[in-house]
């Protein structure tokens, strides 16, 4: 650039660029399993036999 005597020329150029990226991922998994089994078996057997024989002569 040719600047004439007694003249001032100023040129300013400013460029600012800002980039921010944030990523958050949270995953929670809970599994509960309960199994209860109860089995009861009772068997009772009673047998009574009585025989009486009387003979009188």
From Swiss-Prot:
Q: Which residue ranges does the record annotate as region Disordered?
A: 1-57
Cite the record's Low complexity compositional bias ranges.
8-57
Identify this protein by name. Putative uncharacterized protein DDB_G0283527
